[in-house]
Amino acid sequence: MLSSQTSSIFTVSRLNQTVRLLLEQEMGQVWISGEISNFTQPASGHWYFTLKDDTAQVRCAMFRNSNRRVTFRPQHGQQVLVRANITLYEPRGDYQIIAESMQPAGEGLLQQKYEQLKAKLQAEGLFDQQHKQPLPSPAHCVGVITSKTGAALHDILHVLKRRDPSLPVIIYPTAVQGDDAPGQIVRAIELANARGECDVLIVGRGGGSLEDLWSFNDERVARAIFASRIPVVSAVGHETDVTIADFVADLRAPTPSAAAEIVSRNQQELLRQIQSAQQRLGMAMDYYLANRSRRFTQIFHRLQQQHPQLRLARQQTALERLRQRMGFALEARIKQANQRQQRVSQRLSQQNPQPRIHRAQSRIQQLEYRLTENIRSRLSEQRERFGNAVTHLEAVSPLATLARGYTVSTTTDGKVLKKIKQVKAGDIMTTRLEDGWLESEVKSVTPGT
């Protein structure tokens, strides 16, 4: 009985190792809520404590590289939410958890919900850049969805009045905090789309805690922003506050004031641009008029200079000058032609081509003779080599052997018969003669002596 169970006997070390691997592989990383007790921090900087509830407790460790990211000092009796890996300390067989992050219980649960919703909507593609709508440029009417009594609305209106006083603004007042806030925000977005009064929406509120901003982490609000046909600019809290609405919106502004800056034109800048354009237009007009005036003056002087009498006098003077130039040029050309003729005659007498022609003809005859002799020599050499090759080939050719009375026999599969053991009585063989082939059947086989 004992021998049949030896394969399942564990040593203590192997047992603890097996249990540790099972815990780490099967459980993985989990979220645990509980109350802190027995909190200690030795010189190493690691934290050691116990997490407990009304009926159970578990040992916990949080190493220094993880606990330095915690933004508060854990206290005895404090309720916390811990993200941890479950393991077993093999030397003592103690089951424990290794904490990776820690948050106060209330805020931690909200953060967990935030991360879960963010992952869900991201997987559905609600954050994808391809769904983002461009903002109108310029905007002709701005819709604001926020609390009518909040500081955010005051900031938005103040910036719009300063930058673009003529820009129409429609306010869709809603609660931005509390249980009813998400539903009101959704209805305001749907109302703005149904009425179609504005071409861009600012959705937001002032700063606050995670709980204060939670309405903008609501799934209903996120889907309403995504479904809006009007481009939405999110403006929730301060620059460090990031909500689900910011990821879904077509554009995120760090603050409500920044959102107002984004959707509006700067009237002072527009005025400066108009003044600059007027100045450039005035300069261009002055340049154009001055240029046309110069052109008119040039044409007037040209018309005066082209009066028929003036033109006739100038043409007569020019004609006389041409006659003189033609006379001088003709005399110079005749003189140059005579000089050139003399030089050519001298050069021809000095460079008679007849001797050069004779030398070239002699050279050609020599080359022709050498070429002919070379061709004859090479041709004779090639004929001799060809004759030798033919003689050699005829000497080693199987056909020459056949002509002397020999034959070559092969089996049906083409193998040359060299020995009688390659055939037996009844086999068919083919015999090659000088002038053809014979096919014959082996009647008998007699070994040679």
UniProtKB/Swiss-Prot annotation:
GO terms for cellular component: cytoplasm; exodeoxyribonuclease VII complex. One of its GO terms (biological process) is DNA catabolic process. Keywords: Cytoplasm, Exonuclease, Hydrolase, Nuclease. GO terms for molecular function: exodeoxyribonuclease VII activity; nucleic acid binding. It catalyses: Exonucleolytic cleavage in either 5'- to 3'- or 3'- to 5'-direction to yield nucleoside 5'-phosphates. Signal peptide: none annotated. It is found in: Cytoplasm. Its EC number is 3.1.11.6. Heterooligomer composed of large and small subunits. This is Exodeoxyribonuclease 7 large subunit. The gene is xseA.
